[in-house]
Amino acid sequence: MEESITLLTKIKEAFACEGQDVRAYSPLTLAYIGDGIYELVIRSVVVERANRSANDLHKKTTRYVKAPAQSAMIEAMLPELTEEEEAVYRRGRNAKSYTTAKNASVADYRRATGFEALMGYLYLTGQIDRMLQLIKDGIRLAGMEL
């Protein structure tokens, strides 16, 4: 069976990266990469839907990538997660972080960290279709419109 070509596959090839065991990453490492890939997805959709000024694009994107929005999304889609996905989310949510969000409650920030850890896990394990489906479902279930 052929491995699908993904952005991660191309990055690993271009920079001669060896595959790491994703289960060995800390939940905060998963959240770190998850934050970036989630923002890239949202930015891609926002740009694709409207050619606007950078300031307008930033304002639209920010509504979806801030901690309260991510918290609302993960809360709404928790029943949709598999046991494995929920375990990754819980690891991220319960991780001891030394940073806090400027405009979010501690609870929202922790749930957002769990959400980002899940996004990072799905990205690093090549489950891109599942990651995108959860993002779409989370936005819809949280009553947000992209």
Could you tell me what each predicted segment is?
Residues 1-146:
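Double-stranded RNA-binding/processing signature
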